[in-house]
From Swiss-Prot:
Entry annotated with the keyword Phosphoprotein: yes
Cross-linked sites for Glycyl lysine isopeptide (Lys-Gly) (interchain with G-Cter in SUMO2): 176
Keyword Phosphoprotein: yes
Protein task: Through its interaction with ARL14 and MYO1E, may connect MHC class II-containing cytoplasmic vesicles to the actin network and hence controls the movement of these vesicles along the actin cytoskeleton in dendritic cells.
Organism annotation: Rattus norvegicus
Domain of life of the native organism: Eukaryota
Residues with Phosphoserine modification: 182, 266
Protein name, per record: ARL14 effector protein
Family matches, as InterPro entries: ARF7EP_C
Regions crossing the membrane: none
Amino acid sequence: MDPCSVGVQLRTTHDCHKTFYTRHTGFKTLKELSSNDMLLLQLRTGMTLSGNNTICLHHVKIYIERFEELQKSCCDPFNIHKKLAKKNLHVIDLDDATFLSAKFGRQLVPGWKLCPKCTQIINGSVDVDSDDRQRRKPESDGRTAKALRSLQFTNPGKQTEFAPESGKREKRKLTKNASASSDRQIIPAKSKVYDSQGLLIFSGMDLCDCLDEDCLGCFYACPTCGSTKCGAECRCDRKWLYEQIEIEGGEIIHNKHAGKAYGLLSPCHPYDILQK
């Protein structure tokens, strides 16, 4: 079955028609979506879309129906987290995304989440009480129409444009110190861990750099391949993998597949790792 327009534009055609979240396969044209779903799709993908474009049922689940559920950590709009914050998260709705994006001059996407600390910063920086927030919320239809009109002259672009110098890739980037040698290993220059599609060569798995096997992508879109599964560096033809990562709260997540690749890996000096 051919890939959908969304998969082609995002360069994630290998994900089209997966049955992880739906038992059915097939397409929808974007004109079949409601105006609100069409708007959310544009904001969440950063794509310029038309009614004749198609979206497979898998991508409908990922970007529309289950997008909020799949956001597992704070989007960290102020670049304050050294590790991923995953507790007590608050969902950014369409109204808040529009309001806060205009207030702070950076693109916040409906469905992203904020931790209590970032929420406190917003509440402290934006002098708006609950009544004001209610007054600024127009009727649902008017809200959608206004946001759709704004897309006629501006588009948020790819999610990487939200914070090119930071983003989740930087949050998950391993600290450049002596401990880095235990966090990842480097393969010799002529060997690769990942193929040209970003899949693990020894297993064919499309493993996110967060090391969660069920994750469908939790990073900002990679500027090289467009995947949301690439961490600090694009996975395509990459010559190293993460052996473990540390998340907010000090929890260590180990790569269950590192052992399978152990025969491919060779020891390296920590200096080589720091040069990455």
